[in-house]
Regions:
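RNA-contacting regions in translation and RNA-metabolism proteins
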Residues: 1-45, 59-79
């Protein structure tokens, strides 16, 4: 989905290696759940200082989803 691709693009550009993360996307009706599984070493890069990076990504995805009348939830987990 375009939500998965957008998140993947940003995470890929934040991190040095595509092997240090995986992304799972689950779309049910108007709800989209995205889970970013990331290594412990790269967790800080994805979350950012005071959560700024992940917050910005969530705001961006909410804006994209709003025009499709969808709701996107992004979770970050350690792998």
């Amino acid at each position: 989905s375009k939500y998965f691709e957008t998140v993947d693009f940003w995470i890929e550009n934040l991190l040095d290696s595509t092997e240090s993360y995986t992304i799972e996307s689950n779309e049910k009706g108007k709800f989209v759940d995205i889970t970013i599984n990331v290594t412990k070493d790269d967790m800080g890069k994805v979350i950012g200082k005071n959560g700024r990076i992940i917050t910005a990504l969530r705001v961006l995805m909410s804006s994209v989803a709003k025009k499709d009348r969808k709701s996107v939830k992004i979770e970050v987990k350690e792998m």
